[in-house]
Amino acid sequence: RRVAICNDPDWEINPRVHQEFHGLGQVPIEFPEIESTYTAAEAKSEAARCFRCDAETGSADYTVSSRESIFAMARIEPGDTDRQASILDSRLENRVNPFDLAHLATLDDLVFLPANLSRLVIDPYREGCVTATRLGANRGLDLDIPFTVAGFDDAPNEIREAVAKSIEQHGAAYVGARPIGAGARWIQVVSTGTDAEADAVVFDADRAMADDAFSGGSASQPVGLLVNSANVRASVDFALERHLDFLLLDPGNGLPGLAGELAGAPDISILRRAVARLRELDREEEIDLVYFGGLRTGTDAAKALALGAIAVTVGAAMALALGADISGGNPLFDADLDAAEREQRSYNLLQAFTAEASMMARCTGKTNLQNLEPEDLRAITLIVSHAAGVPMAGSLHQH
């Protein structure tokens, strides 16, 4: 603790001190000194350079300026009030806002509250986490996991076959204009007429609301609306009036393709606005919400479930897992993969999504993915707090 201070006024620009190399010597087995040792001055200079490394890679709490302030305060005399006031003023200055007006609200700025703040974390070795989901408030479609896949209507057959097998194996469902495979559940995006083979059907909300004779699918098929950011409020009212089963929220307005999702960051406020309208009408349990857009990981999916969705739809992430090139705005499947590799990749993606989402639920003390709720989340930026309807970290105030 009594080593001389190694702080150097030139610590930011000190060059590296190179030790002279002497080789292994005539008798290497005797382990001679192969490099010259540092002098005291050189050792202090190198220690100062280490301080620079720490400062450049340190946490936000200990930036370069804050560390320099600490050293300055350590050398100040008790009676030097002017310098004390100067240091205090510098510490009270607001830092530059790293998020300008163009900063978008994304799921990255939402974090989960750990369960040990209020309850016990769930041990995966002792208790499982339920992932089974019933999609549809009235006529339900039973899924083993709360995930559906979309965007492969125009993909090559070998890609569709791989995705279909993974969907079937996981007990998920495919969202598209045509079925992806005989064994995979299919939620039909209706353009002309409904298919009796579809496990559920979803209609474009604007077209459905403009059609006075809209009646939905068959009596046994769950019926939903494909909703975008512009018509979410009217779609909620219409769906409740017609006793529909679910709303598929697509802020990019691109389903059944992936162009909308790949065009930019999704509008995550669509979930908050849909839930807010349902709560305003006191009919939150009468219809289910499915979210699509920008989901890259199981953590993203868990955040969407916590914000009010009962299931989510994976699109671009699955395409990327299968080696797609998305630089042109639509996925181009040109990766050199054989059938086994494609099947394994698509299977692994859904497996990873499910495992990671379950992990987030367990970390919040939940044994069912559907028990995730907005109270399990906090926002770290004001724009996301407003978009998602979630309080800022360290606060109960919702912006």
Enumerate the language-model features and the residues they cover.
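Conserved, well-structured core domains of diverse proteins
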Residues: 56, 63-168, 172-173, 374-399
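Ferredoxin-type iron-sulfur electron-transfer modules and their immediate structural context
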Residues: 1-88, 92, 230-231, 260-269, ...
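A structural motif
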Residues: 171-172, 198, 244, 309, ...
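Catalytic or ion-coupling anion/metal-binding cores of large enzyme and transporter domains
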Residues: 329-337, 345-399
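A glycine-rich phosphate-binding loop feature that marks nucleotide/adenosyl-phosphate handling sites
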Residues: 1-4, 63-67, 181-182, 226, ...
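Catalytic alpha/beta active-site cores
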Residues: 145-150, 157-217, 233, 237
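Gly-rich Lys/Arg/Thr-decorated short loops/hinges at beta-loop-alpha junctions or inter-strand turns
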Residues: 25-27, 143-149, 251-261
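Glycine-rich phosphate/ribose-binding loops and adjacent secondary-structure elements
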Residues: 201-341
